[in-house]
C-alpha cells in the first residue's frame, strides 16, 4: 500500500540522511556532507518529525538563518526564499508554532515591507531576486498547510491539524475552493482546546473541539 511505501521511505531517509552535523541532530544533504544546508527542512514539511528539535535548532541558528532568511549552505552568502518558506511551514506544522511565527513575522516585515523587492524571491545573489510564482505560493502554504495543517487524503477529503498561535483568539479561512467544494474553516480558542467548524454554504458540516496538535478528518 501507499502507507507501507511511505513508512519504508521514511526509514530509508532516516538511515541514509539522518546525521549529527555541526553538532545538530538533523540531516546531511548527501553522503560525505558535513556542512549544514537549508534543505534539512524538507522532512518537517513532509510530516517526518524524527529529528524535529535538532533540525529546527539548526535552521534558526546563526549558521543558517540571516535577516533575509535561510542561507542555502552555512558559510556562504546565498539565501533562497524557497527553503526559507518550506522551513517556516514545516516548523509550524511540527508544533513549534511560536518560534515559527516569530521568524515568519521577521521574514514578512523584511520581504514585504522592507528595503528589498516587495515579494517572495527566488534567491540572492544567485537569481538576482527574481519573482517566481512558486515562492508566492509557498508563502500562502505556510498558512494553509502550516497553521491550518490541511493535508489532502482524497478527492473529497482531507485532514487538518490546526495550530493557533498563542496571541490569537481565532483564525478563519473563508471560501476555500478545493475537494470539489467551497467551504469555510473557523478555528477559535475554547479554554485549553480549539473549537473547529467547517461550513458549506454557511451551514456547519463539522463541529469539533480538539486538543492542540490533534488531527481532524474531514469528508465533504
Language-model region placement:
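Active-site neighborhood of glycoside hydrolase catalytic domains
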Residues: 1-17
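Active-site core of glycosidic bond-cleaving carbohydrate-active enzymes
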Residues: 4, 18-142, 146, 150-152
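Extended hydrophobic/Leu-rich segments
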Residues: 16-17, 52, 210, 218
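Non-catalytic C-terminal accessory modules of carbohydrate-active enzymes
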Residues: 93-220
